A protein has these predicted regions:
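Residues lining hydrophobic/aromatic ligand-binding pockets adjacent to catalytic sites
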Residues: 1-276
Length: 276
């Protein structure tokens, strides 16, 4: 059996609600943490992050350079592909040069680059024309980078899709969320053969505060904890969202416990910060 490495983080890092209040218990960031310092503090506790901002356009090189100055060796950024590629152009030929440009820019992250996520909208339905678009799009993806594709329409979870992605070495993103039923998602596990896997733990977007767990979803997480070891991949990237329970770092900790990994302790960096 392949020894697995679980690389667990959150979806984005810039949340003011994660800053510990002056008179409150540790939340995630030390008291007084500014937005400009959040990534550096984040990287002291977690080893990866999914970047949402890249979905709105390819960042300038200076943005990536700034990130690299704030993270230690071994930290990984996973990047969402610009929506112009996935939502506006729906992977057609107009998206090809934009994808090439994005990949070239992503390479600036070097060993800190994790997975590039191609997140397709629910409107990208499992039709024959869209299947042809997907088949023509996959070969333009460079072999030196790792990719995952997220479908938000259950019709894509069929053998044809699994075979196309496995042959291309591209992971099928596995998502806890309102788009694809969990049982459909879990049935796909046995068909995935790539050496990396990509998991997103998401929820309904009705919560507005993100400083603690507001709804306990331990039962759902336990099901993921049982199924994740069944993946064939040697590396499994997992990203939690605030909207799942109310506080993404707490959800990440729960998954770490389920998978037998050391949990993070926000109080530790709070104590260290108070010494200086």
């Amino acid at each position: 059996m392949i020894e697995k490495r679980y690389i667990i983080g959150c979806q984005s890092w810039g949340y003011d609600d994660w800053v510990t209040k002056a008179d409150g218990p540790p939340v995630f960031y030390p008291r007084g943490t500014k937005q400009a310092d959040m990534l550096e503090q984040y990287a002291r506790l977690l080893e990866t992050v999914e970047v949402d901002s890249t979905a709105y356009g390819t960042p300038p090189a200076s943005t990536f350079e700034g990130w690299l100055e704030k993270v230690p060796p071994g930290f990984h950024f996973s990047l969402k592909v610009p929506r112009l590629i996935t939502h506006e152009y729906s992977l057609d030929h107009r998206a090809y040069p934009l994808m090439t440009e994005f990949c070239d820019r992503a390479r600036l992250l070097g060993e800190h680059l994790g997975i590039i996520l191609i997140q397709l909208p629910a409107a990208f339905e499992s039709t024959k024309p869209n299947g042809q678009r997907l088949r023509e799009f996959l070969p333009i993806l460079p072999n030196d980078l790792r990719f995952a594709i997220e479908f938000r329409e259950p019709g894509w979870f069929v053998h044809w899709t699994f075979e196309e992605l496995n042959e291309a070495g591209i992971a099928l993103a596995m998502v806890e969320g309102p788009w694809v039923p969990r049982d459909v998602m879990f049935r796909a596990f046995g068909h995935l053969k790539t050496d990396h896997a990509y998991v997103r733990v998401m929820g309904e977007r009705d919560l507005v505060k993100f400083d603690r767990v507001y709804r306990n979803r331990d039962d759902e997480l336990a099901k993921w904890g049982e199924c994740l070891p069944k993946l064939a991949a040697g590396e499994v990237f997992i990203y939690t969202d605030n909207h799942f329970e109310g506080h993404a770092p707490a959800t990440a900790n729960k998954l770490k416990r389920l998978l037998g990994l050391p949990v993070i302790d926000p109080g530790a960096i709070e104590t260290q910060a108070s010494l200086f």
